[in-house]
Curated annotation (Swiss-Prot):
Example of a GO biological process term: translation
Protein name: Large ribosomal subunit protein uL5
Lineage of origin: Bacteria, Pseudomonadati, Chlamydiota, Chlamydiia, Chlamydiales
Top-level taxon of the source organism: Bacteria
GO terms for cellular component: cytosolic large ribosomal subunit
Pfam families: Ribosomal_L5 (PF00281), Ribosomal_L5_C (PF00673)
Length: 180
């Protein structure tokens, strides 16, 4: 069992139960999945660069990424139907908890001028943010990076409100800016 999963079952559930006064243990929020996505439209013109970014995403997530393709052609953007324009990975289970543990303890402290993530969720129990650079992940070989590429990370929970979601993620180790 992952360290973070064990922490959730032994401590975090009790903390959330006490704070939000749930009547049933099934109401306690759970982290369902983590979605990591990269928009690679500019890299789509260069197959080697596109493939390099796919490999970096695979190394970061420990899972093969799914290539997202254009639904229809747009001449103004030089985009053809079926052309690869991005990649995404959905993490669940043990890989999800391992990624969350690595992200909170190793990656987020490596972000330049990091003072915490914004305290704004989507209102439905999910939390998303963007990273400007993939080079903050220790798994990425800096000598092989051809171009800096950002990514979006979405934490999907079963929480009903932003307060529940942010409390769950904060208990799991994600750092947020303090309210002023």
């Amino acid at each position: 069992m992952s360290r973070l999963k064990k922490l959730y079952t032994e401590e975090i559930r009790k903390t959330l139960q006490d704070k939000f006064q749930y009547e049933n243990v099934m109401q306690i929020p759970v982290l369902k999945k983590i979605v990591i996505s990269m928009g690679l439209a500019e890299a789509a013109k260069d197959k080697n660069l596109f493939q390099a970014h796919l490999e970096e995403l695979a190394v970061i997530s420990s899972q093969k990424p799914l290539v997202t393709r254009a639904r229809n052609s747009i001449a103004g953007f030089k985009l053809r139907e079926g052309q690869g324009i991005g990649a995404k990975v959905t993490l669940r289970g043990i890989r999800m908890y391992d990624f969350m543990d690595r992200f909170c303890n190793i990656v987020s402290p490596r972000i330049r001028d990091f003072r915490g993530f914004s305290c704004k969720g989507d209102g439905r129990g999910c939390y998303s943010f963007g990273l400007d650079d993939q080079q903050i992940f220790p798994e990425v070989d800096l000598d092989r990076v051809k171009r800096s590429q950002g990514m979006n990370i979405t934490w999907v929970t079963t929480a009903q409100t932003d307060a529940e979601c942010l409390t769950l993620l904060e208990c799991m180790g994600l750092r947020f800016k303090k309210a002023q």
